[in-house]
């Protein structure tokens, strides 16, 4: 058993990191990355994810933000169903609930949840970010400097984000 599958062990480890002064814990609430195409999650995955997040939140209380990184492995309907279950734990973000190249579906998820959507590490141009921002598909941008063309291009993207009240 490991921290990706055992919620009690994950909560114990999260509490240890909180005691060390970490202020955020990032994990995939539905387990380790396992799909290469978006998929519809089974009910068991939703139940496991909700239990997992509940136990981790109880372990860290308000000392740590919870960040969900899901690797774009869900369909929009699965992501929305999962988000509705997890909103009660007040996570800071839901990273790439659907594949980031499908901006329409990411925007659908963003409109359906109070959890801020994060994305960007797989995007390469300011034009991709402009489309994402225009559709309000994400409010937290995670640029990879090497992929977007360096500091100058990243600064341009950051300016666009600011104008759209994204970060």
What is each of the regions a protein language model found here?
Residues 84, 90-93, 99-167:
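Shared catalytic-loop signature of beta/alpha-barrel
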Residues 1-3, 166-167:
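Proteins with a high burden of low-complexity, intrinsically disordered sequence enriched in S/T/G/P/A and R
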Residues 2-112:
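Metal-dependent enolase-superfamily TIM-barrel catalytic cores that perform enediolate-based chemistry
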């Amino acid at each position: 058993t490991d921290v990706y599958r055992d919620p009690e062990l994950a909560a114990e480890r999260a509490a240890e990191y909180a005691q060390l002064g970490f202020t955020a814990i990032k994990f995939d609430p539905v387990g380790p990355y396992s799909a290469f195409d978006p998929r519809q999650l089974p009910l068991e995955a939703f139940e496991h994810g909700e239990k997992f997040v509940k136990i981790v939140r109880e372990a860290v209380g308000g000392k740590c933000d919870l960040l969900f990184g899901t690797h774009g492995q869900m369909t929009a309907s699965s992501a929305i169903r999962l988000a509705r279950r997890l909103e009660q734990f007040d996570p800071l973000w839901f990273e790439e609930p659907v594949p980031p190249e499908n901006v329409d579906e990411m925007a659908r998820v963003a409109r359906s949840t109070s959890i801020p959507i994060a994305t960007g590490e797989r995007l390469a141009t300011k034009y991709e970010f402009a489309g994402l921002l225009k559709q309000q598909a994400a409010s937290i941008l995670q640029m990879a400097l090497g992929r977007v063309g360096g500091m100058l291009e990243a600064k341009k993207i950051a300016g666009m984000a600011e104008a759209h009240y994204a970060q």
